C-alpha cells in the first residue's frame, strides 16, 4: 500500500470540495490531494452538460449515488429517492441549476446560535459575490468576477413563466425582480447556474478548470475514501480505494471532509467518529464519541401541482424523441435553444401566515407536467408548480450499516413527522390553487391534473402528500455547526474534540436554508477557505434587505380573485 504526503487532503470533489481545492492551491507553497469517488465530468456527455437534460443523470448510477431512504413512516412507508452527485462537480454536476442563495434571515438566524455570530447575512454576502459572475454584471448584491456563471432570465422565454409570476402577484403576493437581491419574498425570474454558452456551470467547470493545471494540486478520480487515519486525536491521513486496490495518503496539516450530507457523516462514522453506541454495533474502534454525527438530517419535500394547458405552448413536444435531435444539435453547435435552459426560469417564495417571519414555501414553475427525475410525464400540454415547505421541524438521521465503504448507509429523513408539516403542505396546496385561478392564467389553465379538483378536505390533501410528495434533493445539516451537545463542528468547520479535521459542505448547516442548496454550499466553502488559509474575512457588505416585521403575507385587498370556499 503506497503512501504519499500532502498539506491537505480533500475527500469529495463536489460543490464545496472543488472550492477548497481551488482556493487552497492559489498558494503555490501548499499541496492538495483531491479525492473523488466518481469519474471526470465528461464535457461531451450531454446528460450532465446540457441544462435541459437535467433529469438524465438521476436515472442512472454513473453520476448518481442513487441512495434510497428507509421506509418513511409518515409517507406510506415509501422508500424514497435520495440522489446525490458522483463525479467531479458532485451534486453541482446533476442538480437543477437553480441559483438560490437563501433568505437573509436564514443566516441572521444562524448567527443567533452560540459561536456562530459571524454567520450573519452581511458576513456571508461578500462570499456569495466572490463566487459569482452574473451575466448582467455586478451590483451591491451580485458579483462579476467569480468562478460560478449565473444566467438571468432573458426575453423570449416561455410565456407560461410570465403568466405564472403575474398570477402570483394577482393573488396578492409581492413581485420581486431578484430572488437573490434585496427581497427574496415574492414571485419573479429565477437565476440559473448556466454558462453564457449554454452549458451547466458546475464547480468542476467553474473552479477546477482554473486549478487543475497547477502542479500543487493532484486530482484522483474513482477514489473512494474508506477511513480517516488518526494519530491519537489528530487526523493524519486517509485510506481510499481505487477499484480493488487500497492506497493511503498523509496530511501534514488537515483532512477536509466535503462528501455531502449523506457521505460525510458516513465517512466520519466509519473512521470511528460518531455516536458511540452506533459504532459499537459494527465493532468500529471509537476515536471520539460524538453523538451529533449523522443526526439533525434535514431536506426539502415538494409536490407537483399540475394543470392541463389549453394552448400548445408547453414543453410537451420537446419530450418526444423525434424532436430531440434538432434541440440537441442547436444546443451543441450554438449553445442556444430549448437545450440551453433548465426551464426553471421563474418561481418564488411566500409566507402562508402573517406571523411567519420569512418565507416558508418555495415555488419552482415549469412549463411542462413531469416529475423532476423525468418520470410520469403527462401525455398532453401541461404546466406545474413544484411547491414545498422550507424549514420543516422534522429531523432525521444517517446511520452506518456496514464498515464496507461501498455499502450505502441507513437514511431516514423522517419526513412529515410534525403537525406543522401537515399544516404547511395543506396551506401550500390551497395557496397554489388560488394562484392558478388568477386571470393571468385564464388562457392557459385547463383541468387540474394533480392532486385533482375533487381533492379538497384536509384528509384528502394529506393522502395526496403521503403518496405523491418527493424530495427536492436538498439533504443537509447532518454534521451541524454550533456548540450545543449535538454540534459536530465549530464555526470554522473544525470537528469538536479533534485536531486537523474539518467538515465543509451542506452537512454543517445548523438549519436548512430557504431554497436550493448549491449556492449556499459554495458560499460556505469560500468563507471557510479563508479561515483555513489564515486570511482576514472579507469585509461585511452594508446593504439593506427586506424583513417583513409582521407585515401581511398577502395583500388580500389587491387579490383579483378570492379563494373558493372548500
Curated annotation (Swiss-Prot):
GO terms for cellular component: membrane. Residues 183-203 are annotated as: Disordered. It is an enzyme of class 1 (oxidoreductase). GO terms for molecular function: betaine-aldehyde dehydrogenase (NAD+) activity; choline dehydrogenase activity; flavin adenine dinucleotide binding. Its EC number is 1.1.99.1, 1.2.1.8. The active site is at 474 (proton acceptor). Transmembrane segments: none annotated. Keywords: FAD, Flavoprotein, NAD, Oxidoreductase. Gene3D superfamilies: FAD/NAD(P)-binding domain, Glucose Oxidase, domain 3. Pfam families: GMC_oxred_C, GMC_oxred_N. SUPFAM superfamilies: FAD-linked reductases, C-terminal domain (SSF54373), FAD/NAD(P)-binding domain (SSF51905). PROSITE patterns: GMC_OXRED_1, GMC_OXRED_2. The keyword Flavoprotein applies. It catalyses: choline + A = betaine aldehyde + AH2; betaine aldehyde + NAD(+) + H2O = glycine betaine + NADH + 2 H(+). Involved in the biosynthesis of the osmoprotectant glycine betaine. Catalyzes the oxidation of choline to betaine aldehyde and betaine aldehyde to glycine betaine at the same rate. This is Oxygen-dependent choline dehydrogenase. It comes from Burkholderia ambifaria (strain ATCC BAA-244 / DSM 16087 / CCUG 44356 / LMG 19182 / AMMD) (Burkholderia cepacia (strain AMMD)). The gene is betA.
